[in-house]
Structures are given as structure tokens and as C-alpha cells.
Amino acid sequence: MELYYVLLVIIFLLLFKPFVDELRTIYQIIKSFFVPKIDLKEKYGDWAVVTGCTDGIGKALSFELAKRGLNIVLISRNISKLQAVSSDIESMANVKTKIITADFSKGREIYKNIEEELRDLDIGILVNNVGIQYTYPMYFGELPEEEIWSLININIGAATQMTRLVLPKMVSKKKGAIVNLSSGSKLQPIPFMNLYAASKIFLDRFTEALRIEYKNSGITIQCLCPYYVSTKINHFSDHLRRINILTPDVDTYAYHALNTLGVIDNTTGYWPHRVQYAVSCLLPMWIRVYVAGMMYKQFRKDYLKKGAKAID
């Protein structure tokens, strides 16, 4: 009889988290549709800082924030792309922009200049978007040392150090928002994208702990965990760049993601992705790891079969 009760408890525990996740999914989808949009400028401040802003999700978020009335600090490494994005934003919206050139792969040496450039600005929102992925899916032992350091400095170091720079002023004025871009890949280890997936679970845990530390500070600390969005970061796979309801274009994703800021603290940012997340959570970890490994092994084969030509 005791064994029977033990088995019941085990079954309950196995089913409880998926059940809670499903309820949370329904709640988040309803909330994202029916909660009124927040005036981000009024709630957080005049300026938004976006890292990795010249392509992909970062660029789309910069434009969407400008549409909502915020001035934009654009931080990236390519000056010509920065100037083009700055010009396009100022032509589109009645806002100011500020350009800061920084190569986040360089690590510690770049942050002193960024700190000086940001010193006199009323920063309301920090979007830690900058990130890189492998050139293509590969075994960890194949990764060049330089690529390993670049990924650590960009995917982990940038969000950590940028948060350190803006947090004190946000705390002192008791308002602000920090948005960290993680990924749906945080859910499980991903063979052939080992270090990338590990960097995304770091961002998720970093954000969660930060939110608890500063829960009474008046600061919104959000983790965005998108699944696939049609961007150049997935250049190694034509399949991952095809736009559909599960793989939105960057503008669609940015619009929906910003609607969740100040409403949901840990979210995919896009309701079809939340459904994907819920379905994934129903599966045991070993199945998720197996499926992810098979997918990326196939992406690797497809890429190498094409002669490793870059996809524009």
C-alpha cells in the first residue's frame, strides 16, 4: 500500500509542472491580447538602449521602440550600418538617436567608453539583444577558440556588463526596464549548438535572479525567449528562415514582444511561440534533447552538403 501512495506522489509531481505550464500559457496568451498597451516612455523614461541593433530582432525592436516615442541609443560594431539605421529611425519617427560603436566580442575593454557615452542620458529601457550563434551546427571540439571567446563575451558578457552600467541609475530613480534576449533553446541542452544553448539558459537564470534581487525597486526585468524568428542568425538553414506563423518576420515579433513589456516578466514574446513552449514542456527532457540533436545534426549535414556557402 505504501508503494502505491509513493507511485501516486511521483505521478502527481510528474504531471503537476506540465499542468501549471499549460495554465500559465493560457493566462499569458489571454493577458497579451486583452491588457492595454503600456506607454513605455511615460512608464520607463526617454531613452532606450539596444545592443546588436543593425540587423534582425534588435533592429526591429529599435524601430518599434521609436514608433512608441522613445529616443534610441544604437550600439553595434558596424558604423555604416549604425548610421543607416539611425537615419531611417529619425526619418520615420520624431525621435533622437545616438550611435555608439562597440565590438562586444572584445570583452572588458569596450565598456569604459560605453559608460561615458551613456552617462548623461535618462535611460528608461535597456534591451540586451546582441548575440551570436555558431557559424553552423558543429561538434564542440570543432569550435575555434576565437569563436568560443566571442560567443562567451557577446552572449553572456554583454548582457551582464550592460546591466551593470545602467542598473544603478534605474534603482536610484525607481523606474526602468531591462530586457534580456534569451531563446527557446534554454529549455534543454542542444547537441551541435552546445555553447549557444548554454549561454541562453545563463541569460534566463541571470534575469530571474536579478528580478528577485530588485523586486521592490520599481524596475521591470524581463526575459524574452523567442523560438525561431526569420533572421540572418539562422543563415545555415533555409528551413529556419521561411516565414510562417511559427517563424515570424522580425517586425511582427518585435511588435508582439514589446506589447508584453511591463505585463509578463518571462515570456516568448509571441503567442504562437508560447504554444510551442507549452507543448515542449509536456515532453520529457530526453525526448527534447534527442529531437533537438537530430534537427541540428540534419541542419549540419545540409549546410556542409551545400559546400558551406554563406546564405545571404
Question: What do the predicted segments below correspond to?
Answer:
Residues 47, 54-55:
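Conserved glycine-rich cofactor-binding loop
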Residues 183:
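Residue(s) in the substrate-gating loop at a strand-loop-helix junction
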